[in-house]
Amino acid sequence: NDLMSLGIHRLWKKTFVNYLNPQANTKLVDVASGTGDIAKLFMDKVNYKSKVCCVDENINMLKFSKKKLNNQNNVKWYCSKAEKLPFKNNEFDYYTISFGIRNVSNINDVLRESFRVLKPGGRLLCLEFSKVKNEILNKFYKIYSKSIPQIGRFIVGNVEPYEYLINSIEEFY
């Protein structure tokens, strides 16, 4: 995400969590949790006085998230699909999904599941890349996005994840 957003995703995530307006003694499910950035920002905001469940299909991402969150007792990690969460009905005050909704197999199932696990009056927030509407910026974006896989090859020695990222954004819209 640093490469794709030129690091701006950090500001987006911080703004996202601020907009969520987390309160202490609540419960968050962070779906497509990845490296745990949203969970960490949430817990920092409530001084670790809440509970968080990080959900991701990728076990390696969850391992990274555990390290980032220092394996806190009030944070739990689940390797699961967004379409079938291992939680009771009405369990969470907040449901977040960032940079993950475009990767699910069925958005309607994910949304249905999110509302199932949210308490009445709970908050659902989704953060995702989008298409650029400004024509001038869109031209810059198209040039930049075509160069991202090559930059990925240079920096991490791999183009596939970056090609997937660009393609998944294009296909989502």
Task: Describe these PLM feature segments.
Residues 27-84:
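Class I SAM-dependent methyltransferase SAM/SAH-binding core
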Residues 83-95:
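A short acidic, Gly/Pro-enriched loop at the edge of an enzyme's catalytic core
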Residues 108-123:
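A short glycine-rich, Lys/Arg-flanked "PGG" loop and its adjoining helix->strand segment in the class I
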Residues 131-173:
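C-terminal alpha-helical "lid/dimerization" subdomain adjacent to the S-adenosyl-L-methionine
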